[in-house]
């Protein structure tokens, strides 16, 4: 690879690091081209899966201000640069690794810090953002309904008391 090509590759990878909300570093030794294509399809639009030379990736990470990943860049390494929701991409990679034992998750990077294998797996086990928001909305709706009931209870009791007094007064006047 010519020096100019290397500089361009480093700049491209550094840009991907800067634009990514998270990255997942994997080892792909033993996967076929068809397997890699299948993994890229499973990631969809939320992430790009890139295979690059470790030396170029290390330089790009340093250029992008990413620290703590150098020890992950050994052997055949590929990186998933996540532009969307990190949970969705981590789920897709974990599911693919479960089916294809040749894919090994090495770690990742998110919100300014390196992630261990266990942390990437925990992110993959989280529910998606939409599901969590729906659960939160459901919990809030239930609590708001209870609060409304508590606030309306005294007013309805006063209304029932007034109606009972009115009926009693009407009954006394009729008698």
UniProtKB/Swiss-Prot annotation:
Keywords: Ribonucleoprotein, Ribosomal protein, RNA-binding, rRNA-binding. One of its GO terms (molecular function) is large ribosomal subunit rRNA binding. GO terms for biological process: translation. PROSITE patterns: RIBOSOMAL_L10. GO terms for cellular component: large ribosomal subunit. Pfam families: Ribosomal_L10 (PF00466). InterPro entries: Ribosomal_uL10, Ribosomal_uL10-like_sf, Ribosomal_uL10_bac, Ribosomal_uL10_bac_type, Ribosomal_uL10_CS_bac. NCBIfam families: PRK00099.1-1. Belongs to the universal ribosomal protein uL10 family. Forms part of the ribosomal stalk, playing a central role in the interaction of the ribosome with GTP-bound translation factors. Part of the ribosomal stalk of the 50S ribosomal subunit. The N-terminus interacts with L11 and the large rRNA to form the base of the stalk. The C-terminus forms an elongated spine to which L12 dimers bind in a sequential fashion forming a multimeric L10(L12)X complex. PANTHER family: 39S RIBOSOMAL PROTEIN L10, MITOCHONDRIAL. This is Large ribosomal subunit protein uL10. It comes from Mycobacterium sp. (strain JLS). The lineage of its organism: Bacteria, Bacillati, Actinomycetota, Actinomycetes, Mycobacteriales. The gene is rplJ.
């Amino acid at each position: 690879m010519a020096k100019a090509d290397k500089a361009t590759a480093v700049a491209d990878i550094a840009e991907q690091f800067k634009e990514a909300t998270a990255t997942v570093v994997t080892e792909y030794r033993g996967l076929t081209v068809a397997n890699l294509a299948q993994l890229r399809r499973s990631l969809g639009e939320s992430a790009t899966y890139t295979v690059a030379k470790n030396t170029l990736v290390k330089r790009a990470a340093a250029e992008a201000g990413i620290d703590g990943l150098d020890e992950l860049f050994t052997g055949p390494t590929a990186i998933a640069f996540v532009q969307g929701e990190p949970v969705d991409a981590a789920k897709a990679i974990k599911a693919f690794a479960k089916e294809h034992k040749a894919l090994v998750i090495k770690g990742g990077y998110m919100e300014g810090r390196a992630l261990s294998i266990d942390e990437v797996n925990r992110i993959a086990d989280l529910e998606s953002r939409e599901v969590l928001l729906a659960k939160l909305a459901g919990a809030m709706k239930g609590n708001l309904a209870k609060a409304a009931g508590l606030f309306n209870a005294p007013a309805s009791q006063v209304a029932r008391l007034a109606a009972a007094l009115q009926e009693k007064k009407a009954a006394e006047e009729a008698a």
